[in-house]
Amino acid sequence: MVDAWGSELSQALSSIGPNSDILRQRLIVEFQFGPNQTLRFDKTLTGLDLDSGQQQRALLRRLEWAIGRLDIKKIEKSMPAVGMNIASCIKGTRSIDEVAAFPGKITIVGGKLRHHETPSFGASNHLASILIQAHTMNDAKTAIINLKPTMKDGKADLGKIKQTCEELGYSFAKCVKGKITGSHSRLDILLDEGDFGWEPSLYILAHNPLELIDRTHQICSQIGD
């Protein structure tokens, strides 16, 4: 029920767009056990009610929920040999210590996603650094995941990746050894083609961790065709 509700909310929020500010949030949950046995919780928050600590805790919960929504069947071919990670930040973040991610790496073991610890701030350096760079250019993007790009003749298939971006309406940019090249007002997909001793990586960016999962499934399905 929670997943279905979350999916509907995510789709509705995506249609509104990332530039809208929340003025009020109202959450109503009701359980009825019998004619005279009803539990009802009705909570209203304004957009100013969340302090920084609450925002950070909410972000960590979103990361936990996001990893639970990843479909292994859709992403297993895009799993990097070194494992993947998901990172996210609060809008306006400029320090990697303020970026939340999973300590270590997320891997597939026995057909299930495995991560050793719950997400925490300052747990990532490389992925957090790329997110900070992207967020500085395109501040609406606050979430990122790293994947293995589709390969051709031992190299990242640049043509296939660009074609996928065009078909899905996503912007495309490159990074070299973790440094985004050029200046961009919009960033959706980043490709690091790799080098000697440096594994090629595909980075997907989104407005939040939940949208990131939807984009990841969409792109992995498209590239895998």
Model segments located where?
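Conserved mixed alpha/beta catalytic, RNA-binding, or beta-rich assembly cores of soluble enzyme
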Residues: M1-S15, D21-R26, Q32-D225
